[in-house]
Amino acid sequence: MARKVFYISDGTAITAEVFGHAVLSQFPMEFEAITIPFVETNAKAEAVKKQINDSFITTGERPLVFHSIVKPEIRDVIYSSEGLDYDFLNTFVAPLEQQLGVSAAPVLHRTHGKANHSYEARIDAINFAMENDDGQTLKHMDKADIILLGVSRCGKTPSSLYLSMQFGIKAANYPFTEDDMDSLKLPEALKRNKHKLFGLTIDPVRLQEIRQSRMENSRYSSLRQCRMEVKEVEMMFKKERIPYIDTTNHSVEEIATKILDMTGMERHMF
């Protein structure tokens, strides 16, 4: 049976989720996650406490509880549950207060709220990634921070969206399709922005598996076609001196981190 995990916050619970996922990913076992944001009143906290306690009674195992709760009175209710508490704010804030010699001034929703100065940049970047996904248009390439290239289904779209959502980076992406293979070359708008180009490639066998789930038993998803497209696009990357990475067996977080590391791009937000 999967171990029950709760991610709780009086805000969005994004911080608790990121913190918890980072820790639990180190353990080779299954977890059943429940995320509960906006626990802003004692009544809501008591309801969450009951949910945690019910889980303990049902499973016989104390649930893992990752939380980032600003209000002390809400936090105390969660502390009194049968869960095993992992408090992000108290774990790191108290030692920092000692080192910095300054008391923290917690503000609810500050981390991910609209008041954050990077909010507008994040929204602009997300909109840009969606409008410039999969080569829909080449009109805005001059405004892109980075342009991801690769064959269809190699991870361009999720990587673009992750870069925009997590770091506020305006990421466009452009696919090379079967129709491009006879005379594979960069469109003029991409040539003009060659310093922004970054390639993604993938193992042909893995690519076939992904394409089969979308268009089973088609030419598009045949191993022969996948091998040919990957080979041609990698040759073009080398010819044009476009840096690229293999996305096979890498998560979108790892892909994005490798892109940032190799390009030296500045993260617009943290």
Swiss-Prot record:
Binding site for ADP: G150, V151, S152, R153, C154, G155, K156, T157
EC assignment: 2.7.11.33, 2.7.4.28
Keyword annotations of the record: Kinase, Nucleotide-binding, Serine/threonine-protein kinase, Transferase
Source domain of life: Bacteria
Pfam family, one: Kinase-PPPase
Reactions catalysed, as given in the entry: [pyruvate, water dikinase] + ADP = [pyruvate, water dikinase]-phosphate + AMP + H(+); [pyruvate, water dikinase]-phosphate + phosphate + H(+) = [pyruvate, water dikinase] + diphosphate
A GO term, aspect molecular function: phosphotransferase activity, phosphate group as acceptor
Keyword Nucleotide-binding: yes
Class of this enzyme: transferase
HAMAP family linked: PSRP (MF_01062)
Family membership: Belongs to the pyruvate, phosphate/water dikinase regulatory protein family. PSRP subfamily.
Task of the protein: Bifunctional serine/threonine kinase and phosphorylase involved in the regulation of the phosphoenolpyruvate synthase (PEPS) by catalyzing its phosphorylation/dephosphorylation.
Name the UniProt record assigns to this protein: Putative phosphoenolpyruvate synthase regulatory protein
Taxonomic classification: Bacteria, Pseudomonadati, Pseudomonadota, Gammaproteobacteria, Alteromonadales
